[in-house]
Each structure stands twice: as structure tokens, then as C-alpha cells.
Amino acid sequence: MRITTFQQLEEICLKRNKNIYEVMMTSETHSGENTEYHTRLQATRSLFAMNNAINTGLKSTEPSISGMSGDNCAKLQENFGKNKSLFTPTLQKIMTYALAISEENVRMGTIVACPTAGSCGIVPSVIISYAQDNNISQDEQINALITAGAIGKIVALKLPLAGAVGGCQAECGVASAMASGALTQMRGGNVSQIINSVGLALKNILGLTCDPVCGLVEIPCIKRNAFLAIHAVTASELAMADIVSMIPTDEIVDAMAQTAQLMSPLLKESAKGGLAKTKTAIELERNKSMV
């Protein structure tokens, strides 16, 4: 049984009265892709690595090799410590963790690509922050990770999850949808709400370009992880209120794939357009080449 659409996934879950992670594990077992044991083992290892990346990133101000980043997480932590934020403690944690992991990535630390290295801070920051503040067990976090993986897997059947093919909508955008679905599940949302949250997250980042300054996964990638982690929470919040996307999730994925085809190659990880060709970016590139 190969699951290729969100509609098919929802129908199977409802028919069998199963959760998304249960259906996807069964599907992979039947197809010979993986056993339930190995799926959960891989998710457990990923969760361990994600926590390590957070803990390391929170303590470090070491600059990246380029010198363009490395202290964003520390600055945010310092500002949150002044108790002037509009965000709740959990939202503060989500933003901070997203930056911590993303900065670990540019320091060449160990991260989990979920679905890509450039979007590595979004899924773990949302899952782990919510889990820590709401007594969510490790098993439930693993279930959430498997659900997030299922979401990414279905999207990837229509559009490769790479900035060079689909722009950043296919990286940070899909990561945000994965995080939103995982969060909605942890909050007790039903299958329809989970899939709706995916659609809500995706349709509001359509056309997001991949235009890395100096061709490095730093500017705007690191800060974008923090923004789209909060975007995931917004999608979950709307879905939990039963605010339904008028465009079905599968059609949104189709629109994303079409948008990727229409997008100029200059805006798909080439560093030849968008932010990468601003005056300041060109100057940074020039200075970098002189080092």
C-alpha cells in the first residue's frame, strides 16, 4: 500500500481509526521500505541528535566559517531575558531553538536535515519546545517526528525538497508544514486538522525564493528558520480552531510544484538573484573572496 496523497492518507486513517504515524509505519513495513522497529529507532536517534544540537547551540557564540553569523541565538536569549517580549515562553523557546540549531549547522556541527540542512531548525524547535513545556513523552515526540516525516514524504512525491529545484518553499516551507502537522498532532488534533494545518502552512509560503548570500546557508536561512517555526505554530493554531483552507492540501502541493517550475533558476539556490544580488550581498561576496 503506497500512500501518495494527503486525501488518501486521511481516508485510510479515518477508515482504520488510526493515527498518521501508525498508518505510515504500516505502509513502510508492507512495502519493505522499513520495519516499525527501525522506523522508531531512526526517529529516536534523530530526536537525540536534535536535542544535542539545541543544547550545543544555546551555549555557543562561535562564529561560522564565513564570520557572517554565530551570535543570533545568544542575542535573542539575552533579549528574552529582559522580559519585554510579546511572545509566550514556549514561543520564545521555539524561536531560540530554531536559531540554535541553524547556527550549529553553519558551524559544521551535527544536525538532522528535516527535510534539509538549510531548514534544520524548524521541525525540532517546534516539537521539542512544545514537548518540554507540556510534559510530552519521548514516545509522543517520536510519533510526531514520524508524522512530520510522512508529510515531507508525500510532498516530495510531487516536488523534490531542494532549494535548487523548488526554491525555499520546498525547504523551509515544507519544514514548516511538517512542524505544523507534528505540533497539531501533539496538541490532540485529529487527522483532518493535521492535514489542514499542512495546507495552511504551505499555501502561505508559496513562491518563497532560495537566494543565499555568498551561496552559503546563512543569510537569510538562519533567521528564516526562526520565522517559519513560528509560521508553523500559526498554521496549527488556525487548524485547531477548525479554520479550514478552501484549497485542499493536495491541490496546494500541486500549486507549489507548478510555482517551482515557473520560478526563475536565478531564484533557486544559484545565488544569482534576490537577496544574493543586493549591493550589500555583493560586497560581502567580494570581501569573502579576498580572505
Model-derived features: positions:
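Generic N-terminal targeting/processing segments that precede catalytic cores or assembly contacts
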Residues: M1-G109, D133, D242, T249-V291
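Conserved active-site and cofactor/substrate-binding residues in soluble primary-metabolism enzymes
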Residues: Y37-A49, P63, P89, K93-T96, ...
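Glycine- and small hydrophobic-enriched segments that form the cores of compact globular domains
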Residues: L86, A113-C120, Q132, I136-S137, ...
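Acidic-glycine-rich active-site phosphate/pyrophosphate-binding loop
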Residues: T88-N105, E140-L159, N204-P212, L267
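Conserved phosphate/anionic-ligand binding catalytic regions in large, soluble enzymes, centered on
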Residues: M108-V126, A170-A175
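Alpha-helical support elements that line or immediately flank enzyme active sites
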Residues: P124-N135, L183-G188
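Glycine- and acidic-residue-rich phosphate-binding/metal-coordinating active-site segment common to enzymes
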Residues: L145, I151-A164, Q169-M178
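Functionally critical mobile loop/hinge segments
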Residues: G181, Q185-V291
